[in-house]
Amino acid sequence: MKGLAPHTQRIFESVAVLECIKPYILVGGTALSLQICTRQSEDLDFMKWRTSKDESPEVDWYHIEKELETIGEIQSRNLLDMDHVEFVLEGVKLSFYSSPKYSPVKEPIPCLYNLRIADIRSIGAMKMEVMMRRSNFRDYYDIYSILKTGISIWEMVSIALDYSGHRLKTKNILAILTNGARFRRDERFNQLSPIYQVTTEDIECYIKECLSQSK
């Protein structure tokens, strides 16, 4: 599969056939890279969301771990909460998270065997929402890459607002997107073979250009 780092590529098909991933959708940079191939991605981040108000978010980490053990060596397990667990399998980080929010992904995209991925717009919206809590250059680069496909920045902002339950405000999202100084390129980023050689200033300018266009 294109868009995967070599060590992730080695286990990807084995992960895709697991039963335990069926309730989940692959999100984040890897789901994006599989679709637009603008850089390699390493981590496999799986999410599911609540479907009713009475539902209690939780992850069946024990059965997930048992299935992962059938395809390789688990180097570590980090049980962050009952709704979130992270594994390192054969050098690849896999996370499983059951979100208390409702899903922003209207139509998951079948990818390989049991593995489904989020659509590009939803990935962009989720990245905007998570950028309120972290300042990873990869997220900023991914927003730029999505915009280069022609997807509207205003459409992603709208989805991000809905996803947050409208706790986020448009002005907060735009303040972060137009402040490239918050994002510092990490040393390992170039190892991911990005196709765009851009600085934070380049990305900031392009985002402002996109924002200046009509909604």
Language-model segment annotations:
Residues 1-215:
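Compositionally biased terminal segments of proteins
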